[in-house]
Amino acid sequence: MNRRLVGFLGIGAWVLFWAASVALAALRPSYSHVVNTVSELGAVGTPHATAWNVFGFIIPGVLLAIVGATIARTANPVPSLSRTLATVLLVLCGLAVAGQGVMPAVMANGVADVASISTRGHFVCSLISAAAWAVGALLLVGPMKRNPYWQNVYIVSAALVVLTLVVALALRGTLPDGLAQRIGNAFFCVWFILMSLKLVWLEPQLASSVRVGGPV
């Protein structure tokens, strides 16, 4: 698949995620972006839950899996164990996001029913998506530094991962759940958007390099 197209898909995944979040939350007057987590939009039995799970989790997750694989293989063009692991982890990240929509949480008054298999699966997918992304992205920092086409983003990439982890640990319990989650999601989102933009801008450069016989 054309890397430029994949880059646009990565941007589109997040546009869809945030647009669905805003639109579906607006249909629930009691929902607060500060207090409520995004999982509550798709909780079993809530209004428009299926719409959120499809447009907020499943479609964006599948797109992020495709984008993640392309980012890993483009940023690290040399076949290696590190490249394979980064590719697998970023694909797993996207699929785990989609998995949160396949297994929505069961909640009552904003409290998760941890006895529910679906709820447990939802939270496991959430943890997997975060951990797989963090490790996968960090595995690409070295290759990005060595790749002349990606050298200008390796520091930002590492910083966004660190910021996401710091926010996840530091803000838990100090801010309302919805706000803390969205701040963490913002760094996660920015990483994918920046890397997707890199794919969009990079494709013409790579095509030009191939035409003149330069390195890919």
Q: Where do the PLM segments sit?
A:
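Hydrophobic, aromatic-enriched alpha-helical segments typical of multi-pass transmembrane helices
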Residues: 1-31, 36-206
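Short, intrinsically disordered terminal tails adjacent to the first/last structured region
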Residues: 205-216
